Amino acid sequence: MTKAQFYIEGMTCSACSSGIERALGRKKFVQEVGVDLISKKAFVVYDENQASLEDVFKQIEKLGYQPRVATDTPNTFLNPSFLTPNVKLALVLLGTLGVLALSMFAPLLPLPSFLKNPFINGIVQLVLSLMVMHMGRNFYVHGFKALWARQPNMDSLIALGTSAALLYSLVLLFRAYTHAPIEGYYFESVCVILLFVMAGKRVEENSKDKALEAMQSLMRHQSLNALKIENGQSVEVPLESLQKGDILQILPGSYIPVDGVLFKGEAEVDESMLSGESLPVYKKEGMDLFAGTLNTTTTFQMRATHTKAQSTLAKILTLIAKAQGSKAPIARLADKVAGVFVPIVIGIASIAFLVWLVLGDFTRALEVFIAILVISCPCALGLATPMALLVAQKEASLLGLFFKDAVSLEKAKNVNHVIFDKTGTLTLGTPLVQEVRVAEGVDRLELLTLCASLEAQSEHVIAKGIVAHAKEQGIALQEVQEVQAKPGFGIKGVVGDQIIKAGNLEFFNLPNPFGTLEGIQVFVGTETQILGVVVLADSLKEGSKEAISELKALGVKTTLLSGDNLENVRALATQLGIQDYHAQAKPEDKLKVIQELKAQGKVVMMVGDGVNDAPSLALSDVGVVMAKGSDASLEVADVVSFNNDIQSVVSAMKLSALTIANIKQNLFWAFCYNSIAIPLACGVAYKLGIMFNPMLASLAMSLSSVSVVLNAQRLRGAHFKIRGSHENRHSS
């Protein structure tokens, strides 16, 4: 099976996207298909032995749409000609005003005498109407092709309604040519309908572009070239050629090309595209740098630790591509309704036409037929969910969050139990030296020098904490010979003229001269004597305590699961106010806890970052991973916190609740609108003097979809509200 991603031009409503999905889904060579109306992206999983991508494209073209091979952005295939959407809309407006001047407003205007001739007046209206229809020709091309393929959409409704008005106007024009009396033409209905529909579409497209802007801007953070240091000189090279270990020069105002560490110098880096925080982050030698972030101040050198394809930015862009093709359950329901909506509307319009025709009023029958086709709005149904989800994804990015699919964004609001891993999630994951104790007669700095010199030979996280502390103290490390590491116990080597060991108490097999100590203990000594002990502790992440408090306030239960020893886990749980905790938990133990909670009917969120968290993240209802997590955990998680902030858990739940509430408002409005508008267009309130003519119907339809789009925009600024709620709670 082969998976292909591409763009589809010409879709206007969810009936279009769902129609493409149904048409392709019926083909034997297609295993899976997904089409996103907003981003215009599509993917197809097909059997390459039975068909090619060209065959897939032919099926789409039969429906009246134009597939395009995927590039960096869906906007690259837009027509760059003079007839831009805004120019088309302006020409439609001018043409419509001309037709209205010749029809509805003719008695009020000083028109030339020859235009008062019904036939000549009709010919001029026809010419102007044909120009307007040409500007909106996509409605007819897509609409009639979709109708012919038995996948009618909103374009089909517009095409049928305006074509009926045009054909009847041509009949009236012929009657005017024969000097038969006529009451008027329907050219103004054709033009006004197209004007309102196209104006509504422009508002929708502008809103979509704004919502997509935050995602597409990430593309602009990806450099094409980098300055590589070769033989002491900086040489510009393609980004794809960079390898791990390459030394790069970063100039002020340039984007960091790949992930790495600061090698020489210092800098302030704008990491807002990852964390959502606007203030630059100070960086010194040895600190992490991320692709796509911006160097705001000085020139410095960095060492690449990842290639372009492995960078954090590349992972984000991959996640975005996957997320844009996903649909939430609530969106699938709306798509199903929209898929059958158009055929039902055509049926209702046809029945209403026949009823009014039987009543002996052909003109009224035609107006009702056109009004029903035009007033019905599958767009409102189709846009209700994807627009809200798209705006929510943008707001999530401003919170340093990314939802990998629409399903997780919908689920997060229902979470009622959160399980936390300890190291790297609630804590920094980098043990820091808390105290150094020495035996009688031993110098503290000398002991720290011996320990750090030895630990510098190890890549263990505890060793790094000790070495970092020694460097902060200004200690110069000594050379170590004959280094031997014993996993699970410690390390030893020759420093100067003596054998020095550093590790746990079992490594020495000697009594502990310092008594009970809390934290991670690294004993230092010779083969026969313990000279001292370095005590380390993993520091609590900023905001961890506040996040747990907020979850409690929301009525969400919390559990701490860790592979650490009972003493450390209990101490952390007590500090955070978590009553349910499990120590020395293996990956299978974590799975068991999640299974038990789910069996009790709990909606479980797992928050972690390590390789051993990957199975738990996959099993939970919503898996949240810190961005510095392993590739395995990033792959299976549902939500990624790129700012490594534990409060992202609360933010994800709050944003989910706001988004689903907005979607429900949109769907409620869309269903109510269609439930009321269609019967009124049928003429059920005719006796009360309420009747929609085609022009009013088109205005109502356009306002319906525009109102849904504008309501979705109310989610903009949600990140301010969520951040504000955190700050207000912490200050109180």
Curated annotation (Swiss-Prot):
* TM helices/strands, residue ranges: 89-109, 123-142, 150-170, 188-208, 337-359, 366-383, 664-683, 695-713
Q: Which residues form the HMA domain?
A: 2-68
- Look up the domain of life of the source: Bacteria
What name has this protein been given in UniProt?
Copper-transporting ATPase
Record topological domains on the Extracellular side: 110-122, 171-187, 360-365, 684-694
Q: Which BP terms from GO are recorded?
A: copper ion homeostasis
Q: How does it sit in the membrane?
A: Multi-pass membrane protein
Could you tell me which InterPro entries the record lists for this protein? Answer: ATPase_P-typ_cyto_dom_N (IPR023299), ATPase_P-typ_P_site (IPR018303), ATPase_P-typ_TM_dom_sf (IPR023298), ATPase_P-typ_transduc_dom_A_sf (IPR008250), HAD-like_sf (IPR036412), HAD_sf (IPR023214), Heavy-metal-associated_CS (IPR017969), HMA_dom (IPR006121)
